Regions:
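Transmembrane helix-boundary elements of multi-pass transport/secretion proteins
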Residues: 4, 42-132, 160, 176, ...
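Small-residue-enriched core segments of transmembrane alpha-helices in multipass membrane transport
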Residues: 106-112, 185-199, 219-226
């Protein structure tokens, strides 16, 4: 007796048509392409870039960003030159100072001021980057924090060389006189010493929000320059000289003037520079560590 299939027991199998075959092949191809994408995005296969990510394109980007900032260029290069030309409208070329003249003294002070403004601004720029979210984006990349800080320092030093050169180029116009070795040695001391204020700028940049950082830096730098004797020479042993000897720019300014031979060398200048360098580095590392922990 033959059995007839009941409607309730009927099992419908998926058709093995060409359409089904096409769907199957399409799924397999999409799976293979997805797996290739996963392989390309496999984070475990990423390796740290050389030098922690420090590269010429990164430095070039930072330099362009700094030079596009008109306020930075004015305060770092134009303003020191304007101050030097303004303060030397009276002819001081006949007034001796060490193995040079008073004009050379004032030139060194204004060149130092411009260099410190440049390096401080390079460090303090992190405040704007934090506010815009740029620094947080960078921390999601393989770029190491030390490479990021090194890039800031190198860019600050490169532009500070422009500030020093701009002021020194105006020296002969105002009849600045000193031996060739003093021109070179004083410029090198200014350039290397300005690295201290990269740490100061970083400390301020991580300490204050972007709206306040640059507003604080400008007046504060002017006050420190005044206490360091860069605008008006301080009388040795005076009350202002004793107060200024504990401020960050005092040691750098006197070290830059030392090649002129007007004053004997003092180790207090070196202690002053190293102490403030330690303070600025410690403060910058502390604030940067807390900022990094947010990500």
């Amino acid at each position: 007796m033959s059995r007839s299939a009941r409607p309730g027991n009927t099992v419908t199998l998926p058709p093995t048509t060409s359409t089904g075959t096409a769907m199957s092949s399409s799924q397999s191809s999409s799976s293979s392409s997805a797996s290739s994408v996963v392989k390309r995005l496999d984070l475990s296969s990423r390796t740290a870039p050389p030098l922690g990510g420090l590269s010429l394109p990164l430095l070039s980007l930072e330099v362009r960003r700094r030079l596009r900032n008109r306020r930075s260029v004015i305060f770092s290069i134009v303003l020191p030159v304007a101050f030097f030309l303004m303060f030397t409208t009276t002819d001081y070329s006949a007034m001796p100072y060490g193995n040079g003249n008073v004009v050379a003294n004032m030139m060194i002070g204004m060149a130092l001021y411009g260099a410190l403004m440049t390096t401080t601004g390079a460090g303090a720029a992190v405040s704007n980057e934090r506010a815009s979210g740029w620094s947080r984006q960078l921390r999601l990349t393989p770029l190491k924090p030390i490479a990021y800080i090194t890039a800031k320092a190198i860019v600050g030093m490169l532009i500070s060389a422009l500030a020093i050169g701009a002021v020194y180029a105006c020296g002969p116009v105002r009849h600045a006189q000193m031996p060739a070795r003093v021109w070179i040695s004083s410029a090198l001391i200014i350039w290397l010493g300005s690295l201290v204020f990269v740490a100061f700028g970083l400390f301020v940049g991580y300490l204050l929000p972007s709206d306040n950082a640059m507003q604080v830096v400008g007046p504060l730098m002017a006050l420190l320059a005044f206490l360091g004797g860069m605008f008006i020479p301080l009388t040795p042993g005076s009350t202002m000289d004793r107060i200024g000897s504990f401020t960050p720019m005092y040691g750098l300014h006197n070290l830059a003037l030392w090649p002129m031979g007007a004053e004997s060398f003092s180790w207090w200048w070196v202690v002053n520079v190293l102490t403030w360098l330690a303070v600025f580095l410690g403060g910058a590392a502390w604030k940067m560590g807390r900022d990094t922990a947010r990500v």
